[in-house]
């Protein structure tokens, strides 16, 4: 059927088993050829040693390994948006030791002032920093202790004071103890 010498043997179609002697497949390698031709003639002890050598390396996946084992020195980048700013920024919460350092960093990040005053007196400032917690609720920055804030914060937003009242966000009286 196929003409010899033209290299068309590989494209030859057959119905059923070949009548001739099976040829060694020269185009593709079998798994045993890739594996180095490991023979199964040895005892069960030999097979166990081969299995140990051929185990999958890197399991569990690297991503879950990093999440579980590299918590120390990790970075907690949070998205920060500001009303009126056409861009978002990210800030690492782990670099800051408290709300005052965070407020100063936000002021430098967006070139605005008054965020630090908003933490102390939210009634007399133009902008108010708020955050979304794990439950999806928006809260004022400074309402909870710093450690709890770091654990629950998903993203930050700097709103105008008039818009924050629409969210029904009122500062708690005990706000100054966390600052």
Curated annotation (Swiss-Prot):
Q: Where in the cell is it found?
A: Nucleus
Q: What are the PB1 domain coordinates in residue numbering?
A: 75-163
Q: Where is this region: Disordered?
A: 31-52
What keywords appear on the UniProt entry? Auxin signaling pathway, Nucleus, Repressor, Transcription, Transcription regulation
Q: Does the keyword Transcription apply?
A: yes
Where is this protein chiefly located? nucleus
The signal peptide, as residue positions, is none
> What single Pfam family name could you report for this chain, choosing any that match?
AUX_IAA
What are the BP-aspect GO terms? auxin-activated signaling pathway; regulation of DNA-templated transcription
Induction per the UniProt record = By auxin.
Which Gene Ontology cellular component annotation is one that this UniProt entry carries?
nucleus
> Entry's PROSITE patterns?
PB1
Q: Motif span (EAR-like (transcriptional repression))? A: 13-17
Alphabetized InterPro entries for the sequence = AUX/IAA_dom, AUX_IAA, PB1-like
Does the record bear Ribonucleoprotein in its keywords?
no
Question: What is known about its subunit structure?
Answer: Homodimers and heterodimers.
Q: What is known of its domains?
A: The N-terminal half of the protein contains two conserved domains I and II. Domain I includes a slightly degenerated ERF-associated amphiphilic repression (EAR) motif which seems to be involved in the activity of transcriptional repression. Domain II is required for the correct degradation of the protein through the SCF-mediated ubiquitin-proteasome pathway. Interactions between Aux/IAA proteins and auxin response factors (ARFs) occur through their C-terminal dimerization domains III and IV.
What job does the chain carry out?
Answer: Aux/IAA proteins are short-lived transcriptional factors that function as repressors of early auxin response genes at low auxin concentrations. Repression is thought to result from the interaction with auxin response factors (ARFs), proteins that bind to the auxin-responsive promoter element (AuxRE). Formation of heterodimers with ARF proteins may alter their ability to modulate early auxin response genes expression.
The family line of this record is:
Belongs to the Aux/IAA family.
- What's the protein name? Auxin-induced protein IAA6
Species annotation: Pisum sativum
């Amino acid at each position: 059927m196929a003409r010899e010498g033209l290299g068309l043997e590989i494209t030859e179609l057959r119905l059923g088993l070949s009548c001739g002697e099976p040829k060694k497949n020269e185009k593709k390698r079998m798994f045993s050829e890739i594996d180095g031709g490991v023979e199964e003639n040895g005892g069960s002890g030999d097979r166990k040693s081969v299995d140990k050598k051929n185990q999958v390396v890197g399991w569990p996946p690297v991503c879950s390994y990093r999440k579980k084992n590299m918590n120390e020195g990790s970075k907690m980048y949070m998205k920060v948006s500001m009303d009126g700013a056409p861009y978002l920024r990210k800030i690492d919460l782990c670099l800051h030791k408290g709300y005052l350092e965070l407020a100063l960093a936000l002021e430098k990040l967006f070139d605005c002032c008054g965020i630090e005053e908003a933490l102390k007196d939210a009634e007399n400032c133009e902008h108010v920093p708020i955050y979304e917690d794990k439950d999806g609720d928006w809260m004022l920055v400074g309402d909870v202790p710093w450690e709890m804030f770091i654990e629950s914060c998903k993203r930050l937003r700097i709103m105008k004071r008039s818009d924050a009242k629409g969210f029904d966000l009122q500062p708690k009286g005990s706000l100054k103890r966390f600052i």
